[in-house]
Design a protein with these regions (language model features):
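A short, compositionally biased
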Residues: 106-108, 157-161, 206-215, 553
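Structured, hydrophobic secondary-structure cores that serve as assembly/anchoring elements
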Residues: 1-118, 166-169, 219-223, 282, ...
Length: 579
């Protein structure tokens, strides 16, 4: 309790009403697949447009090189075409994919490697030029002019221990290395030639002492990076190994060793004097690897800890994604792992593709029967789209397109609307035209067909999960519960460690009541009143004294989700004129 020791008036603020509770995002997708470039471990990359995807992961992949694993770029393109606004992408690469590296003579001194594996790195070009981060003049030579290595300079700022420096006068350049630098006093490894002649007190000096660095220019397509005034001095803040961490194209490893003589880093790397002015670096040996070396494990990924996860596991720490897909990868082991990932987290929903070759109803059912989960849905057939790479029509898996429709429906109608009876944008045809009789078999089993209707375009014509439990057979019901659960979870962190008694219970009830009332008014819950749409129980009827003693606050919530009008039936009879 507050202390009141001095007489006076005290004004205090306190929270008593319902806490605002924001709805969780449901329209952000997560994709996994092969790409030209991009990180293969760590956190998935946020992508907000297809141009953004191309900048980070490269363009479309060729069928000859990547076969049926090439569909990530097409899926992301279709996601944005069909209304998606943002997604996270994680790249997968074959185990024998190799990053490009510099192949010039300097590689034994400075190893430059593409940030991630792939033949894309062979197109990188780089060049180094001499540079300097600091320049000064010598005001005074301290000690014996013939032997002294200590000098008072105008400013020692930028002159670090271990830096190679150049003293230049009318007689040319001489290189040295700094032993100590403090308070405008610099000590070198050896005395400069010339004795007192190195001193220059003029306003416009002709004798200068400069540090020796180099600037690295990197080019890839229309991308360019410049890292200025780099050093091979390991102790310096501008050491190339530290500075290159900011690069999106290359990583660097300094293999140089300190020489007996002071040699400028440009010369150490290139073998050329600084007067050469520029040294070009060539890259090669990068490889995309062979898709024959891909396995289910590459897509499932490994949990090697934060920042080192791969494949599906890389999405563990992402709390934004709510829709997941691995476009075109129909290996049951991969798909089952994706579904298990969604079930374990309880906050996302998987969209599954059916193998392209499985077009007959019996074959489709064989694949469908592998799964039984309300956290996934399956779509067929594959879609015909225009390929910007080969300038022809190709067939792609539907998962990316459907993910875009999920996002579009969520943003325009709400998560309570079944993502069906929606037109597919950018789709010119279907690989298979299913009829009503075939859908009569597939729809009850939970296979959502995409069909073309004359005059109405190509539409998603199903909204069922892969669950055998009738309570969870509709996609929008499962996703509505995900929305409600995540919203309440994210919005009630303030409750933790609060005193667990009646005032807190009443406040929690008011908070959730206000949120669910808003959800009901948005049309997501059935009923003509909030009392019919949901209930909230919290208090002694939901908690025993043992629960309270063990720090548990238990709130029981029931909601009535709206169900889609899947079968619209009009019963028509004759009416005579006399009736």
């Amino acid at each position: 309790m507050a202390e009141y020791l001095s007489p006076g008036v005290y004004v205090e603020e306190f929270d008593s009403g319902a806490q605002p509770l924001e709805g969780a995002s449901t329209s952000t997708a997560g994709f996994i697949g092969l790409a030209q470039r991009g990180a293969t471990q760590g956190l998935p990359e946020l992508i907000t447009s297809i141009a953004d995807f191309k900048r980070v992961f490269g363009s479309y992949l060729s069928e000859n090189a990547f076969g049926s694993y090439r569909f990530l770029a097409y899926a992301v393109d279709q996601f944005f075409t069909n209304g998606g606004s943002r997604c996270y992408v994680m790249r997968v690469a074959p185990s024998d994919a190799v990053p490009a590296s510099n192949t010039s003579a300097e590689a034994s001194v400075l190893s430059l490697t593409a940030k991630n594996p792939g033949a894309w790195g062979n197109q990188i070009r780089a060049a180094i030029v001499p540079a300097s981060k600091a320049k000064t003049q010598i005001f005074e030579l301290l000690g014996d002019p013939a032997e002294s290595k200590r000098y008072r300079v105008k400013s020692s700022a930028g002159f670090n221990v271990g830096d190679v420096v150049a003293f230049e006068d009318a007689n040319g350049k001489q290189y040295n290395r700094i032993v100590s630098s403090q308070d405008n006093l610099i000590e070198l490894e050896s005395a400069l030639e010339g004795g007192l002649e190195v001193v220059d007190n003029q306003l416009l000096p002709t004798k200068v002492l400069t540090t020796c660095e180099f600037t690295l220019h990197i080019f890839y397509g229309d991308e360019a990076e410049v890292f200025e005034k780099l050093s091979l001095n390991v102790a310096a803040a501008n050491h190339i190994g530290k500075s290159m961490d900011r690069s999106g194209l290359l990583s660097a490893l300094d293999l140089s060793t300190a020489s007996a003589e002071a040699v400028p880093p440009f010369t150490v790397i290139s073998g050329l004097p600084e007067e050469a002015g520029k040294y070009d670096i060539v890259f090669g040996n990068g490889s995309d690897g062979s898709i024959a070396n891909l396995s289910a494990g590459d897509f499932i990924g490994e949990d090697n800890g934060p920042g080192r996860r791969t494949g599906i596991q890389s999405f563990i720490d992402n709390d934004v994604v709510s829709i997941m897909a691995i476009p075109g990868v129909t290996d049951p082991n991969v798909q089952l792992s994706l579904v298990a990932h969604c079930e374990n987290l309880g906050s996302r929903f998987a969209i599954l593709d059916i193998p392209r070759e499985k077009t007959k109803v019996a074959d489709v059912m064989t694949h469908r029967n592998i799964f039984d989960s309300s956290y996934c849905a399956m779509y067929n057939p594959w879609l015909q789209v225009f390929d910007p790479l080969d300038k022809r029509n190709i067939f792609i898996p539907p998962s990316g397109t459907v993910a875009g429709i999920y996002s579009r429906s969520d943003n325009t109608r709400g998560v309570q609307k079944a993502p069906a009876n929606e037109v597919l944008r950018g789709v010119s045809g279907l690989e298979v035209q299913y009829n009503n009789g075939e859908q009569d078999i597939l729809n009850p089993a939970g296979v959502n067909l995409i069909r073309h209707f004359t005059g109405q375009g190509t539409r998603v014509w199903g909204a069922r999960t892969c669950s055998s439990n009738g309570l969870w057979k509709y996609i929008n019901v499962r996703r509505l519960f995900i929305f409600v659960e995540q919203s309440i979870k994210n919005g009630t962190n303030w409750v933790v460690f609060e005193p667990n008694h009646e005032p807190l219970w009443a406040r929690v009830q008011r908070t959730i009541d206000a949120f669910l009332t808003r959800v009901w008014r948005d049309g997501a819950l059935a009923g003509t009143s909030p009392q019919e749409a949901f209930y909230i129980n919290i208090g002694r009827q939901t908690m025993t004294q043992d629960d309270i003693d063990n720090g548990r606050l238990i709130c029981v919530i029931g909601i009535a989700p709206v169900k889609p009008a899947e079968f619209v039936i009009f019963r028509i009879t004759q009416k005579t004129g006399s009736e």
